[in-house]
Amino acid sequence: MIRALLLALLLANPALALNMSGFRDAPITRLSAEELKDFRAVLMKILDETPDGTMVEWKAPKTPFTSKVTPLKTYTGGKFPCRDATIESDARDRFQRGRYTFCKEPNGEWQFARPPKK
């Protein structure tokens, strides 16, 4: 259920679907549905407001989970703004760090996109 909720909340656009096998044992699977919703809201705010190179840390209110999000690069991908970001998450028994690309859709929502260009 958490995997389905994660997919629905973070990867809502089916055109940008992600292979979830890489997230099966991810720290984010430890979050409750409400915490996952909160994390998504924080991530959207970070992508909207945080300058490149600035790390923002978020801690789940109940679950032992901490995530550090650092926007790295802002650019235009086609017609829409995109941002590469590093997300480092730790849920005590699980740790994951990756670089991800998000692009802003016409509806104003940031969506997970293709892997970032190096």
PLM features per residue range, with description:
Residues 1-8:
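Sec-dependent signal peptide recognition
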Residues 12-14:
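N-terminal signal peptide c-region/cleavage motif recognized by signal peptidases
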Residues 16-60:
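N-terminal trafficking/processing presequences and adjacent post-cleavage segments
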Residues 57-59, 83-90:
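Short beta-strand segments that buttress and anchor functional surface loops
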Residues 62-81:
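Surface-exposed, charged secondary-structure patches
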Residues 69-74, 86-88, 98-103:
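Hydrophobic/aromatic beta-strand elements that line small-molecule binding cavities or substrate pockets
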Residues 79, 89-96:
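Short, cysteine-centered beta-strand-loop-beta hairpins and adjacent loop/turn segments enriched
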Residues 105-118:
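Short beta-strand edge/turn micro-motifs at domain boundaries
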